[in-house]
């Protein structure tokens, strides 16, 4: 059971009064062939996306450091607005669609929060139950409301942005061929990287490499993003309807939770970290991206102490579309905690028919779940996953 702790400002594990951060690390695996691809042309359905040069606040962005292009919206859920395929993820990059949509999903028995004991479901599938922004608390940890979504965007950094040739990066972002990308488009992408580097939301929970070990993010010393990664994207979202300003005063109301499956909001903050490594297609890491989802149960402004989530389930939801979506099969390997998609026919209309490539396969591998607070192996350590 997960109970509320007002001093911490979040819910805590009942047994040891620890912060609940449910982290599901997911690896997106795509394989069957290794081939470097040049971007010379894209689908005519491609649309240009221009970053706002004044507020540097893209509503969507893409992880594209290696052989996968994976888009996400600032609410931490899928978007099909970035890829010319109308999909969330493309593999290999600049070719066919791989994942149509995905998102984090949870369900729990909510007890003692004043809305009646009931099962509630939250997160994102085809419908989005969250909005961008963090949950705002006072100095005592009382929930005041949620941040205005307009103050948030998809933060994206790459550690070599200042010196790297960003032609391929910009071409993928703008859905144009590498020969057609403009100097202005490359400059906009570079400027966004710089903006996010110097405005990295470490205070809200975004990961970074604390180079000098002082516990505070310094953009002139530290490295933003998942430590060691070549590229990182980060979002923060919540289901608290009341929107407040920095002083905690009400400025709006947006109840997104019922948009998913009709359930009332719980008071969840979800942080998504996506990262990848700049390896080529012949290296396994060049065909993988990593995802970490941190879920905090903080409650609503009127949630009493002692409210709890019982029997919580937290999972990755996905609708994979592998090229031609009408001939896809899915499977799972329980021992490896691996779910995958593969083509039901020998040939695929998109990969074989358009790009003259063998059809790939891929899926999701759960690497680590939340700590269960139980000493199952009797080694004296209750921090087990």
Language-model-derived ranges and their functions:
Residues 1-39:
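Bacterial Sec-dependent N-terminal signal peptides
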């Amino acid at each position: 059971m997960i109970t509320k702790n007002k001093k911490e400002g979040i819910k805590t594990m009942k047994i040891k009064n620890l912060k609940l951060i449910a982290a599901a690390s997911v690896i997106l695996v795509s394989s069957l062939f290794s081939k470097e691809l040049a971007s010379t042309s894209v689908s005519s359905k491609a649309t240009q996306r221009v970053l706002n040069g004044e507020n540097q606040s893209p509503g969507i962005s893409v992880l594209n450091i290696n052989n996968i292009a994976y888009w996400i919206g600032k609410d931490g859920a899928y978007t099909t607005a970035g890829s010319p395929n109308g999909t969330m993820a493309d593999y290999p990059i600049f070719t066919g669609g791989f994942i149509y949509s995905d998102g984090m999903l949870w369900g729990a028995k909510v007890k003692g929060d004043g809305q009646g004991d009931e099962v509630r479901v939250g997160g994102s599938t085809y419908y989005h139950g969250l909005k961008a922004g963090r949950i705002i608390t006072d100095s005592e940890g009382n929930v005041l409301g949620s941040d205005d979504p307009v103050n948030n965007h998809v933060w994206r950094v790459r550690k070599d942005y200042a010196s790297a040739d960003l032609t391929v990066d910009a071409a993928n972002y703008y859905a144009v061929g590498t020969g057609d990308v403009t100097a202005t488009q490359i400059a906009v992408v570079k400027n966004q990287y710089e903006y996010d580097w110097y405005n990295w939301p470490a205070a809200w929970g975004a990961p970074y490499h604390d180079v000098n070990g002082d516990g505070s993010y310094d953009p002139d010393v530290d490295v933003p993003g998942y430590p060691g990664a070549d590229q990182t994207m980060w979002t923060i979202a919540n289901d608290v309807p009341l929107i407040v300003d920095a002083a905690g005063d009400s400025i709006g109301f947006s109840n997104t939770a019922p948009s998913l499956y009709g359930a009332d909001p719980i008071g969840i903050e979800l942080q998504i970290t996506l990262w990848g490594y700049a390896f080529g297609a012949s290296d396994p890491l060049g065909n993988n991206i990593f995802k970490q989802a941190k879920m905090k149960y903080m409650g609503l402004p009127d949630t009493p102490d002692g409210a709890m989530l019982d029997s919580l389930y937290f999972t990755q939801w996905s609708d994979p579309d592998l090229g031609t979506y009408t001939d896809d099969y899915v499977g799972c390997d329980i021992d490896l905690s691996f779910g995958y998609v593969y083509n039901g026919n020998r040939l695929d209309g998109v990969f074989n028919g358009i790009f003259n490539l063998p059809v790939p396969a891929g899926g999701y591998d759960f690497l680590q779940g939340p700590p269960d607070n139980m000493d199952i192996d009797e080694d004296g350590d209750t921090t087990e996953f």
